[in-house]
């Protein structure tokens, strides 16, 4: 076999093996697709989840579970109303902690 052909063949094989594990398309898997825009009363919220940005979802997600019907609502983390709600919840928790 020609030495230059052997080198080309080796380079082709090496390049093919290097791309084997690279995903072709990255899927985004966020829990929240749409945001609840109406204001919420803090007392109506049973549980508040804050999911930080990750590789699977590039933005912060805030999910409120309502006390009355266990409905989950996605909240807009950029909204001023939600920022003040998070601040109020944080202050309430700090008062409870000994």
From Swiss-Prot:
PROSITE patterns: SMALL_CYTOKINES_CXC. Residues 1-21 form the signal peptide. SUPFAM superfamilies: Interleukin 8-like chemokines (SSF54117). GO terms for cellular component: external side of plasma membrane; extracellular region; extracellular space. It is found in: Secreted. Keywords: Chemotaxis, Citrullination, Cytokine, Disulfide bond, Inflammatory response, Secreted, Signal. Pro-inflammatory cytokine that is involved in a wide variety of processes such as chemotaxis, differentiation, and activation of peripheral immune cells, regulation of cell growth, apoptosis and modulation of angiostatic effects. Plays thereby an important role during viral infections by stimulating the activation and migration of immune cells to the infected sites. This is C-X-C motif chemokine 10. The lineage of its organism: Eukaryota, Metazoa, Chordata, Craniata, Vertebrata.
